[in-house]
């Protein structure tokens, strides 16, 4: 019977996901709106740099006057991803749909596996999936273009492998070292795939769960295992993480976060059936409803309350308290000494806002506790369990229908922008102050970048790099670190020039990471400047370059020369070295364990 129930429940789950995302498959050649241009630009840049220029996507020359691409947390996120082959082989609109659908399915499988650690019931596992994987919040966030939210798909996987690695419940089998590696690998994927909020929140959740589990088990093993997962994730993600940290060191992202929500607003978040992008509700302080809504419906809310009250056990108590802490963070800055303002003072969390995002992982934890409470009830039912399972399958089918109906509301607007009719080019490159009129499409609150990348044109305006974002510029359009200039600007002197005024500089070969400049008639001791924002990763002829008014400058030692500027993040190779050492350590530990088993 359980096998049949498994099939039925997965049919319900897949039908729900299909219904929620069905609007994306109407016109399959459209793009998203709101924040989607930024995310589409990041993905298109990876494709163009690899396919057209045969380079690794280290630098983005097209936006803000140039900025690190691989060192951005939200950029370069398809390079180490299961979706890279699809982006390289498909059109951008088609690949976007593969990623969104794929991450929804990945989240569903992860939530199912996590629930399996707490219940044998297919229906209860399915309840965890349908209430978490593609609920109202997921739909609102993805529709708005917050593709970093997709990385939450790895959160249940991390918790699943971590729980197996700790092995606090002996009835579920002995702990395995490989699960420590797998948990670390999932955390590393969150780094590579742009989990700007999911990653620190998942690390925090694992830390909370580990501390509380150490208290309930009276053992340090959960803390040690959590630390091992963290160290492995650091090593496995080092090629991406180190450049990110280098960028954050130079351009710290510090934001205020004074958002609050009252109890009536919280009830609306979970139960109001008006959950579209333009919905308006009271009880919340700021931002659009896409930053608050998380519809799961009254049946799930009631089940969660009962589950939290009835949930008990070594792991369940630890998960419950971890979930309640995350939930309290979601209420924001309702008091100066509330959990969120205190956490927001700490490194990493200083760069985050919109604390309602904590409610999503809180929901997952409390759903797992509820699943355990339901399992205990089903065990007591003895011979009546089969009948109860049938009732639960019917109930979870209704929940899937209910949540799916509401999550369907925003996804109707997910991909509505027509693909720009812009010819893709690798022709001569130049920088404009603003996006040329002929490239403007579906203007949103931030400047568009996709069409500039397609036409091989750079812009000073941008929304792809937080440090240079138009939103943070002064009235003159300036922000620290922005040194490049666009055509028509009084300070624009070409894409390469000699500031001293003697001699000429001409770009003869151009690609995102490498620019060759031919210099004639210069005097020794002069300099050649590349019209891109300065970053320590730039070099010229194998030597470091200078920061000249926030642009890239190299020394000249002869009157005629070809100067090749190249960009690579300074911490990339050290990160690769750490990655290789980490892989070697994992391989060594695996071989040692095999030998030990063979000798036993």
Enumerate the language-model features and the residues they cover.
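Membrane-embedded helix bundles of polyisoprenyl
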Residues: 105-118, 123-171, 175-215, 225-244, ...
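Membrane-interface helix-loop junctions at the exits of transmembrane helices
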Residues: 18-26, 85-90, 94, 123-145, ...
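Active-site-proximal, structured, solvent-exposed surfaces of multi-pass membrane proteins
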Residues: 328, 491-600
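Membrane-interface coil-to-helix junctions
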Residues: 14-108, 130-153, 261-287, 332-340, ...
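Signature aromatic-anchored transmembrane alpha helix within multi-pass, membrane-resident enzymes
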Residues: 227-234, 368, 374-404
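Periplasmic/ER-lumenal interhelical loops and adjacent helix-loop junctions
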Residues: 37-58, 230, 235-309, 425-441, ...
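Start-transfer (signal-anchor) and selected internal transmembrane alpha helices
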Residues: 1-23, 225, 390-393, 584-600
């Amino acid at each position: 019977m359980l096998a049949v129930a498994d099939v039925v429940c997965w049919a319900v789950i897949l039908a729900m996901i299909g219904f929620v995302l069905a609007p994306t498959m109407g016109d399959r050649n459209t793009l998203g709106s709101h924040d989607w241009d930024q995310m589409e630009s990041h993905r298109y840049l990876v494709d163009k740099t690899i396919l057209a220029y045969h380079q690794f996507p280290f630098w983005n020359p097209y936006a803000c006057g140039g900025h690190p691409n691989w060192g951005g947390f939200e950029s370069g996120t398809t390079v180490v991803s299961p979706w890279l082959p699809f982006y390289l082989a498909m059109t951008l609109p088609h690949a976007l749909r593969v990623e969104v659908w794929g991450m929804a399915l990945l989240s569903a499988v992860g939530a199912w596996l996590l629930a399996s650690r707490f219940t044998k019931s297919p229906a209860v596992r399915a309840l965890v999936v349908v209430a978490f994987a593609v609920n109202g919040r997921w739909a609102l966030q993805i529709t708005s273009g917050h593709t970093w939210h997709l990385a939450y798909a790895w959160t249940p996987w991390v918790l699943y492998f971590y729980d197996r690695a700790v092995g606090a419940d002996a009835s579920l089998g002995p702990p395995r070292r490989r699960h420590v590696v797998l948990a670390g690998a999932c955390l590393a994927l969150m780094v590579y795939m742009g989990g700007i909020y999911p990653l620190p929140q998942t690390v925090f959740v694992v830390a909370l769960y580990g501390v509380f589990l150490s208290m309930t088990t009276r053992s340090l093993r959960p803390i040690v295992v959590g630390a091992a997962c963290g160290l492995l994730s650091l090593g496995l993600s080092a090629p991406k993480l180190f450049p990110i940290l280098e960028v954050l060191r130079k351009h710290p992202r510090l934001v205020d976060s004074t958002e609050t929500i009252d109890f009536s607003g919280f009830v609306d978040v979970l139960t109001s059936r008006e959950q579209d992008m333009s919905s308006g509700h009271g009880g919340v302080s700021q931002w659009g409803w896409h930053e608050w809504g998380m519809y799961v419906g009254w049946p799930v809310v009631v089940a969660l309350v009962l589950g939290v009250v009835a949930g008990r056990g070594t792991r369940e108590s630890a998960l419950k308290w971890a979930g309640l802490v995350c939930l309290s963070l979601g209420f924001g800055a309702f008091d100066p000494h509330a959990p969120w303002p205190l956490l927001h003072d700490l490194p990493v969390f200083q760069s985050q806002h919109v604390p309602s995002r904590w409610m999503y992982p809180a929901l997952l934890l409390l759903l797992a506790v509820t699943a355990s409470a339901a399992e205990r009830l089903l065990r007591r039912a003895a011979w009546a369990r089969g009948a109860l399972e049938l009732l639960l399958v019917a109930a979870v089918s209704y929940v899937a229908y209910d949540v799916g109906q509401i999550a369907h509301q925003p996804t109707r607007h997910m991909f509505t922008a027509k693909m720009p009719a812009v010819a893709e080019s690798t022709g001569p490159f130049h920088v404009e102050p603003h996006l040329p009129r002929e490239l403007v499409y579906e203007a949103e609150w931030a400047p568009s970048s996709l069409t500039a990348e397609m036409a091989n044109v750079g812009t000073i305006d941008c929304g792809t790099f937080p440090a240079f974002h138009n939103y943070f510029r002064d009235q003159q359009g300036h922000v620290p670190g922005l040194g490049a200039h666009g055509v028509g600007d009084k300070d624009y002197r070409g894409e390469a020039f000699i500031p001293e005024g003697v001699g000429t500089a001409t770009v003869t070969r151009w690609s995102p990471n490498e620019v060759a400049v031919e210099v004639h008639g210069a005097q020794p001791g002069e300099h050649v400047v590349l019209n891109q924002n300065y970053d320590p990763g730039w070099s010229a002829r194998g030597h470091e370059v200078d920061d000249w008014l926030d642009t890239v400058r190299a020394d000249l030692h002869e009157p005629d020369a070809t100067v090749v500027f190249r960009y690579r993040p300074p911490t990339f190779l050290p990160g690769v070295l750490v990655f290789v050492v980490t892989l070697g350590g994992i391989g060594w530990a695996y071989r040692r364990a095999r030998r030990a088993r063979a000798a036993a």
